[in-house]
Amino acid sequence: MSRRDKMIAKIKELMYKPEYIRNIGICAHIDHGKTTLSDNLLAGAGLISEDLAGEALGMDTKKDEQERGITIDAANASMVQEYEGEQYLINLIDTPGHVDFGGDVTRAMRAVDGAVVVVCAVDGVMPQTETVLKQALRENVKPVLFINKVDRLINELKLGPEELLKQLTSIIVEVNALIKSLAPKDKKNEWMVNVEEGSVAFGSAFKNWAINIPKMQETKFTFKDIIDYCNEGKEDELKQLLPLTEVLLNMVVKHLPSPNVAQVYRVPKIWDGDIESEVGQTMIKMSPDGPLAGMITNVAVDKHAGIVATCRIYGGTLEKSSEIYLVGSHGKARVQQAGIFMGAETIDTGKVPVGNIAYLTGVKGASAGETICSADCIIDEFEPIDHISEPVVTVAVEAKNTKDLPKLIEVLRQVSKEDPTIKVEINETTGEQLISGMGELHLEVVTNRIINDKKLEILVSEPIIVYKESVLGHSPVIEGKSPNKHNRFYIDVQPLDKPLYDALIEGDLKEGRIKTKETAQDFIELGMDKEEARRVWDVYNRSMFINMTRGIQYLDEVKELLLEGFEAALKDGPLANEEAVGLKFILSDAKLHEDAVHRGPAQVLPAIKKAIYASIMSANPCLLEPIQKVFISAPLEYMGNCNKDIQNRRGRIIGQETKGVIAEMDFEVPIAKMFGFAGDIRSATGGKGDFSTEMKGFETLPIYLQDDIVRQIRTRKGLSPEPYGPEHYSA
Ligand SMILES: Nc1nc2c(ncn2[C@@H]2O[C@H](COP(=O)(O)OP(=O)(O)OP(=O)(O)O)[C@@H](O)[C@H]2O)c(=O)[nH]1
């Protein structure tokens, strides 16, 4: 039996022993070395040749990933590791670090129980380090820390033992400060990383060595010895003495939870169903014989196998040829293959029990975020996966040959399934297909893949910024009349209170129609008036619909219609047909026709929509634009050039710090002004500057620009150039 076959046999055995399983994600800021680390772990496990690790990029399986040298999709692999005489199954996911692909990280975190957070020893904690930690901790995923590129501190920066220790300690302190502020309340202390206990390792993924305190105790190696080995040109020996795979995976096995431990606190957080039910108990007790409960966290399309879904099995067993039910889309499908991932390959094991990360094929309707269960035992859905960022840039695409239009529609449907952070819409007026994504690079990758992988010739427009609509003031009470004039709704609007708005952005408050009274308490804790808090009917697009009427006959019967109308109105605001956000609507009175026939959808929907539009237009409507945080690090003499470039982009200076001869600068810049930034900053710093970006959120567009931008958007969308005033909607 080859080493690989033996490993597959072992994996099949360990799959059934949850205490010997670890599901982990590797995540970091871009370029800090996740993929090099994952590749070396794969090589250590015999999954790719050791010579190719770091070059072959076994986890970066797509051609564009290898060409660009960055990870775009999350990739998976299962491997076996021995720790203290026992063998363990490690299911690993490598995730992208670039801000544009944050959606993959969030989804990967739903599949795992632990995360190896990789931080570059030279750069330290960077913006995406904070974002990925936030994504992990929000999903109740426990972190350990690997400080990578320590070889550079020794070989390039020539640090001695004391300075080395100082630099490493400052990174650990910063990471722990983040864990303390972001971890779930009951885990804050337990989850901070600890050098003494060995939940922090240091090393070089590139040179294939790593060390932590347990390894120091075992080998009697010190940082001084490591520095000496590097200085004496014996770095290659370090990988024999301090093998990266062993140190890293031992840390994972010892400090990250097995699924049977993690599911006890993760399932109640990510699943809304009744924990005491049969399904709930199957998940908590990790029973492979109970009802199937799984969540699809990623979907890819393979030329031969069709849709290949990644699925975390939370209960029961996924079986080949079985019929499963897709809870969100209400579809049924027959599983063709069920097995595990091994980098670029999949191994069909026929069955995958609870606690593992599986792949499955044959599920045509699968999309990331979908709950799956057995067709004869339907379960409650898992919580939707919240994405921290949201689309900020759009491109219009059209098929080069009009005969390809049906194919384009099909391909776009597939693309949005593979990547739920992509939004695909059709502009009803112009017939254009619009793809919105997290940034220019994200859309470039998506459209290139349509051309190269899906073999479809398309024309792609210049990127268009996504704006949002909101209000600055408080409208008077507006009357919305139904077409038959027998139904009238009286509402007003004002900006939603900031603490509530922020909590919705952070995902601390969930959106949706309010079903239980308990939610009111969360609103009250954020400063909302008690009476209003108890009367919230719906939270949608970071806006609230509050019913403050009393004793209106038939109101409950039209409630669903009112909320449908409210949500539809916010999808396309009255100013520029962009989404409306951050609004608080109060319904203060209503008059309804006593006969149900006269208060149906055709009457109620237009009445509420008109009232919403008129109220927005009378409350000083405004546009919000997406803002990016930009961090530039460059030699001091280029600081002036950088500031000038940023100011030309309507940017703001947030902070500047000098570290030796290097200036570290923080800015905030509208995304509308970021096009071409990479090239410009390269020339502004003589090629010596580095930069990274992070999404800040949406902020009010300067008022002097608003009329022009509104006109531009409306004209592009085929609407009249000027928006209608409130009187237009009260006719
Ligand atoms: N000197 C040194 N270079 C390293 C080390 N680890 C990674 N690198 C280099 O750093 C660069 C980025 O490494 P990757 O592994 O692609 O980084 P990543 O975090 O996966 O990047 P994305 O996938 O694009 O987010 C590559 O040029 C690596 O060769 C290390 O330990 N030491």
Swiss-Prot record:
The keyword Protein biosynthesis applies. It comes from the Archaea. GTP binds at residues 28-35, 94-98, 148-151. Pfam families: EFG_C, EFG_III, EFG_IV, GTP_EFTU, GTP_EFTU_D2. Keywords: Cytoplasm, Elongation factor, GTP-binding, Nucleotide-binding, Protein biosynthesis. It is found in: Cytoplasm. Residues 19-234 form the tr-type G domain. The keyword rRNA processing does not apply. The modification Diphthamide is found at H598. InterPro entries: EFG_II, EFG_III/V, EFG_V, EFG_V-like, EFTu-like_2, G_TR_CS, P-loop_NTPase, Ribosomal_Su5_D2-typ_SF. GO terms for molecular function: GTP binding; GTPase activity; translation elongation factor activity. One of its GO terms (cellular component) is cytosol. Its main location: cytoplasm. Belongs to the TRAFAC class translation factor GTPase superfamily. Classic translation factor GTPase family. EF-G/EF-2 subfamily. PANTHER family: ELONGATION FACTOR-LIKE GTPASE 1, TRANSLATION ELONGATION FACTOR-RELATED. HAMAP family: EF_G_EF_2_A. Catalyzes the GTP-dependent ribosomal translocation step during translation elongation. During this step, the ribosome changes from the pre-translocational (PRE) to the post-translocational (POST) state as the newly formed A-site-bound peptidyl-tRNA and P-site-bound deacylated tRNA move to the P and E sites, respectively. Catalyzes the coordinated movement of the two tRNA molecules, the mRNA and conformational changes in the ribosome. This is Elongation factor 2. It comes from Methanobrevibacter ruminantium (strain ATCC 35063 / DSM 1093 / JCM 13430 / OCM 146 / M1). The lineage of its organism: Archaea, Methanobacteriati, Methanobacteriota, Methanomada group, Methanobacteria. The gene is fusA.
